[in-house]
Regions:
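Bacterial N-terminal signal peptides that target proteins for export
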Residues: 1-11
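C-terminal motif of bacterial Sec signal peptides marking the signal peptidase cleavage site
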Residues: 19-22
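N-terminal mature-domain "stem" immediately C-terminal to a signal peptide or N-terminal signal-anchor/transmembrane
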Residues: 24-96
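Acidic/His-rich structured neighborhood in mature extracellular/periplasmic domains
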Residues: 93-174
């Protein structure tokens, strides 16, 4: 019994040593020559920039600027029906959502940490370079930030959405 334990322990030790010393290649590929163009839009800033004066036309402009995300955000995530808004009730609802105390607190807390995305943009650019390295034929997705949605998701084949409020950290009051 003792001899079989020694053999098993020796085998495990040999396996670990083999794993540790067998990998001599660098841990990450060289992406210094990889070029990508990063498109980053701030949906949360555009949404919360709505003003009471003529918010109906401002919401129309948002729908034009975010043709894939806008219906996905409000229909799929929010559960609103965008199909028949001839009365403007949906736009009134969106305005009330933006003005609600919860939405305002969420937006304000997010802006305290993420008003400037310069460092995040650098990390994202590096990630997209790795993406291009491993998938050279794939389309680099447009990146859109927002709040009050799942942490990260794709909408369509070329849109990557990141919900910044999900990354506020453990000290966030929200």
């Amino acid at each position: 019994m003792i001899q079989s334990n020694i053999i098993a322990s020796s085998f495990c030790l040999f396996g670990w040593l083999l794993l540790i010393f067998s990998c001599k290649s660098p841990s990450a590929p060289d992406i210094s020559g990889v070029t990508v163009t990063l498109q980053l839009k701030r949906f949360e800033k555009d949404l919360f920039a709505l003003t009471e004066h003529d918010y109906h036309s401002q919401i129309d402009a948002l729908q034009q600027k975010y043709p894939v995300l806008f219906p996905f955000y409000f229909e799929e995530i929010g559960g609103w029906n965008l199909a028949n808004d001839s009365t403007g009730a949906l736009k009134d609802s969106i305005w009330k959502y933006v003005q609600s105390p919860f939405s305002q607190a969420l937006y304000d807390s997010t802006m305290l940490q993420y008003s400037n995305l310069a460092s995040f943009e650098g990390e994202l650019l590096q990630s997209m370079k790795y993406f291009r390295y491993y998938f050279p034929e794939a389309v680099i997705p447009e990146v859109v930030t927002l709040i009050n949605a799942p942490p990260a998701f794709t909408a369509g084949n070329d849109l990557l959405c990141i919900s910044l409020d999900k990354y506020l950290g453990p000290t966030s009051a929200l």
